[in-house]
Amino acid sequence: MKRVCTLPLWLWLGIVSEADLVSSYSMTPPTLSITEEEHIINAKDTLTITCRGQHPLEWSWPGARWTPVEGRRRWNSQPQQRPVGAGNPEEDCEGTGTKPYCKVLVLTESQANDTGYYHCYYKYIDAKIEGTTAVSAYIFVRDFEQPFINKPETLLISKKENTWVPCLVSIPDLNVTLISQNSLIHPDRKTIFWDNKKGMQVPTQLIRDSLFVQCETVIDNKVFKSNFFIIHIAGIELYDIQLYPKKAMELLVGEKLVLNCTVWAEFNSGVRFQWTYPGKQMQRAVIESERRSLQTHTELSSILTLHNVSQQDLGRYTCTATNGAQMLEESTDVIVHEKPFINVEWRKGPVIEATAGDEAVKLPVKVVAYPQPDFQWYKAGKLIPKQSQSSMQIKDVAEHHAGTYTLVLRNRLVGLEKRISLQLIVNVPPRIHEKETSSPSIYSRRSPQALTCTVYGIPAPEVIQWQWRPWMPCRMFSRRSLNSRHRAARRHQRDRMPECKDWKDVSRQDAVNPIESIDTWVEFVEGRNKTVSKLAIQEANVSAMYKCIASNKVGRDERLIYFYVTTIPDGFEIESQPSEEPIEGQDLQLSCNADNYTYENLQWYRLNLSKLHDEEGNPLVLDCKNVHHYATKMQGELRFQPDSNDATLLLTIPNISLGEEGDYVCEVQNRKTREKHCHKKYISVQALEIPRLKQNLTDIWVNVSDSIEMRCKVDGNHVPDISWYKDEKLVEEVSGIDLADFNQRLSIQRVREEDAGLYLCSVCNAKGCVNSSASVSVEGSDDKTNVEIVILIGTGVIAVFFWILLIIIFCNIKRPAHADIKTGYLSIIMDPGEVPLEEQCAYLPYDSSKWEFPRDRLRLGKVLGHGAFGKVVEASAFGINKSNSCETVAAKMLKEGATASEQKALMSELKILIHIGNHLNVVNLLGACTKPNGPLMVIVEFCKYGNLSNYLRTKREGFSPYREKSPRLRIQVQSIVEAVRADRRSRSGTSDSAIFNRFLMHKSQTVQPIQEVDDLWQSPLTMEDLICYSFQVARGMEFLASRKCIHRDLAARNILLSENNVVKICDFGLARDIYKDPDYVRKGSARLPLKWMAPESIFDKVYTTQSDVWSFGVLLWEIFSLGASPYPGVQINEEFCQRFKDGTRMRAPEYTTAEIYRIMLSCWHGDPKERPTFSDLVEILGNLLQENVQQEGKDYIPLNDSHSSEDDGFSQVPSSAQQNSDEEDFDMRIRCHSLAARYYNCVSFPGCLTGGNQIRCSSRIKTFEEFPMTHTMYKAHPDNQTDSGMVLASEEFERIENRHRKEGGFSSKGPNRTAELSAEQSDLRGRCRPSYGSQVGGQTFYNSEYGELSEHSEDRSCTPPAEGASPPALHASFFSEQY
């Protein structure tokens, strides 16, 4: 702290402040016995002065503690020795009533030098002010022999205008003259004044050049002179003062304190230093002075040193420097600590908030410590370099700066350390991501649309507001009018943006386009939780402007959407009539349709083949900007459609020829950007040829009332003119006679005798004609027809009566609502003979706003597999998961030339996929492309590792039965199984879709995959993997069963392997109506997957969930044989089917365990009601998976290994598995210690039952390997045999079927199975499980021959779908063959 002021001002301020202080005491000043201001005594006289006052008093006289200040006096604080006389001249005296204190000053033998001011003041009051706390009198001690009383001294002359020469006299009325080196100076009372108490004041210039001056007076003609005053010219200006160190000084007890007070003064200046500090009374400090005279100024220093500081030395230290005319002052604080310490605390709390885009944010921390510690800042445990201060500043704040920051303070010398943490929250203004990508502004009329705004901000915006306004221009305004915060939040916007008014909130009641829904949800995209809002428009009818608004506490963002509705897709297209491949001689019309709001300047061109290459023959880069260089302009007719605001440029080419084939280009220009756009259409002209018939007509013999059909099939794409003649007369379409397929087909219903004759088919075009004829002969009489008509009429009347009766009955019965029909798979709820599958699919909805995916964002790749009517292609989908990422998918589509029924079947499969929903272990639907002008495609998940059967075969060499159990593996398996149990317990209140999503979240957040994706091919296959595959398939089948879906072809070839060892079920026969489609009736070369089919499916055509359980058992056999074909070495013939019916089963596969084989046998139970449900299998395999992971050492004991002891059981179940089964109702942990592991045929069927203190095992299971079959060869067509033996020749199967009919159908209680299925047998569930039959009710399909419903059929051989058949949907291998 520095103070600078002149000395008079300083004294005046001090006097005023002290006067104010003393006035508060309300005291009276002391009084003297001498009342006059000047008192004269002679030398040698005795001076006696009495002083009285209200407080203790003390005297001061010349030479002792006083300083004259312009008539007001102040005194030094330290008394000096009395300059004259001996002893103490002060004595106490008796006071009075009002002034009880009295002190008398007695001065004997007075001398001339005693002349001066005598002061009496209050002793214990620091403020000594004349007339208030002090009183004085000037005493002249007159001595005619010593009129002058001064001693030799130096007279400092400064830059002042006048200088006082202190010639003090003992006689008041003397005439004094000043003698300088050059002249005599007499007082003139103008510029030169004499004062008998101060001396003589003269102009400085009169004595400045003299070496000395002297005063002179004459008394009685005797001259007296004073001592010499040596003239010394000195500077009076003090430039600056500094006290080092500048900051407050902190020390520990015992340390050394050094303060340096330095003054920079004018050259040749004199300065007096004075220190004020707490220990000044005890004079603890050592003060040293230094002086350095430089060329331009003088540097003076006073150094205060204090050794071994203590607590008493703390306080304010002040250095005062004065030269008589000016005074400077500087202060500092000294803090003394007893011991080292560190104290740290927050300045603004533990949480600091900032906004992304701020220039800087400071993390303030208050630190009080000594000695100064080391500062280190950390974020998330990592040291932040170049941050060594107590408060850290972050510049250009961004989102990644958010987090927890920790300041660590260390004093390594004394071992002290303190930490403090601050949480920095960086708020991010909302940003709408769709603004960064180009979005379409043209929308097709009468089409459903979805407008989406994906917003990211911190904090996340709670609500995204949608507004709309009519389609009209908006005025533009500059972004510079926005405030700084908005500018930071909208850096990606253009400098000018539209400002539109008259906005209205979007609502279903007040909307120019009907609104279906407004949904808002939070989605995890690109590592961030983003808020997504979707405005679903039912039908785009009117052009409008939409705006979505997102805001949070630090900002706001909005997206303006120009919703222009047009009848032209994408605003620009080319159409050709009649087709893109016209026939030679036809009239071709090309239409260039463009939206008039967006485009203008329509122009047709035809590319010149000769100009498409340069001089060297290299192909030119075609660009729309220079299309006129290599194309010929063609004239068209421009038309406008006011109702749709569309422009059409028509190009008509009459009687097109082969030479006019080529590329035709339509060029348009964007009205806003002035950029040109082009569309190209290649016109392929087909040469006109003479028509050709694929086959000629053949003669027909038909009975009366039957129907006939004749086909005149023409080869080629162009169908010529076809005419039918009967007996040279033109046949026209009348009642009973139908012409279809461009007259290629002639149908006659209920043939009569007059329909007999010669029929001629004539096919003609401009090149010529070709004919084919056939004779139709009618047998029988028309009388029989009349009888049949009567019968039909009577039957119709009866049918109408019963139909009305049924309507009345059904009106009184509660029918299921339309919403109820949508909840299940309708072919399961309703009898398929009553309501065909295609009619049920008509009830299922297709939400294009949710599932439709643009074809232009789908890039097709290699073909993964072919089916009978379609193919599966690997594709890359951009943004299919509502993000900007690219994802590999599988696209399922029909082959070229697909019929309408095939497209309808694929659409039905799409609807049922949507109805079933998503599940982790099912190949899920991702989207679809159903809009016209492109192929129908169903987009599903892509599984990179192919089907499970091929994968298992490739991993045989690397199979490792066991591996070291890790805690991570145990935790993962426990988490997966517990998640499944929790989902199953909460299934009554939670949808499968919610369970699926929660399971995925649980898997991604808490469970690390067993194997990483890149290591799946390199990692060995283990027993845990096989059980995990089985568990996942059971879980997926449980989901399909809950959705009323029957697979009918469950096999390893239809199980796909995806990342993280996740398996997915595919080709669940969704859109196959095997009861109505004639293509599924068994024909000569039909292929049936007999090895995977249940007995009731083979012999009774019954497909249920329990028949899928049988197939699951065969799938288990495939998994634990590592992809081997079922029934190895067994020929599929009549003997196989007979033994199959009698209960013969497959032996245990090579790599299975006893527990797994018992599960297989329970799935192969002859009675479907006794088989476990998929829910039971999920519970059993989940328990087995946990036990397998928790075991120590080897947990795999193959059934084929031989043991040295008969007592070695093969059911290795740990004792820890024997727990209470109250929560786990279906426990599979059962031991069969009485069986040796090598006797695998002694495994109980279907399982072992623990009863009492002993374990009973039922009779053995016969296997095909134990009782070899007799090889019987049957003649069959070559295409009926495959390497896998999975099919059976139709003739042989017909013989088995006929025998089966004679025996009365398939039964689980055949004569040869009494011993195997005794009452003592039990399945895997044990005593605590309910009957499996309770899970099957209401899900069985019955065919028309053996079931409850009847259907007349002469063939009577309706079979399950065969691999070679032609279903309305894609074949079962459609998915599996892709991998």
Swiss-Prot record:
Protein kinase domain location, by residue?
858-1185
Name the enzyme's class: transferase
Q: What is its EC number?
A: 2.7.10.1
Residue ranges of domain Ig-like C2-type in the record: 30-136, 160-222, 240-335, 340-421, 430-566, 569-684, 691-777
GO terms under cellular component: cytoplasm; nucleus; plasma membrane; receptor complex
Outline the subunit composition: Interacts with VEGFC and VEGFD. Monomer in the absence of bound VEGFC or VEGFD. Homodimer in the presence of bound VEGFC or VEGFD.
Its protein name is: Vascular endothelial growth factor receptor 3
Q: Which species is the source of this protein?
A: Coturnix coturnix (Common quail)
